[in-house]
């Protein structure tokens, strides 16, 4: 058992000493995903979803393109690399919008913006938007119901353990929202759509292991919010409720 920072240098030191079969990056939150490619480049064998598949989910622009190709509906969105681009995107999408920095942990910096003045304030004060620190802008789905799934996949087949319905409306970070298992108000047709979308994404990204996908249901349509090829905070809850040890 090691108590060390999750950095490339520290992981490599342990890897060289212990000589394991490989490294699993799915169970440490966002940080291991961020260093997966560097570990693979250093000769570490990555077990489960490969860094290439992880990048597909993490790169928001590429993710948007893949969702279009898979015919999965998503809120209108864009990536701004300057304050001017952010203002133009805000005008195109229409307010309110959901804004967040790219490549952050656990939804940090996420905010709902209702007008151009506050968008400018956010871009300057909150994240200092730039080519190195782009801003993600999505149409905010007002009064939407948020749903979430934890799935297991082997690159071909996908098993969705359950669909969770968030008690709070979409826009409240999932870490601050209670959820119901099984869903209470989500129509069966939407539950089926959510399960089908999760399976499509798992196959397309060649997920091997755990996949967490978040959805929003608005105006009788299912929208995808994001997909993360890793274990989420809900895995222990899902395992307890369903009696299925997802980590095992």
PLM region spans:
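Helix N-cap/beta->alpha junction signal
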Residues: 28-29, 60, 82, 115
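ATP-dependent carboxylate activation and anion-phosphoryl transfer catalytic cores
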Residues: 1-22, 30-33, 45-48, 70-71, ...
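Redox-cofactor binding/interface segments in oxidoreductases and associated redox assembly factors
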Residues: 25
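Intrinsic disorder at enzyme termini
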Residues: 40-42
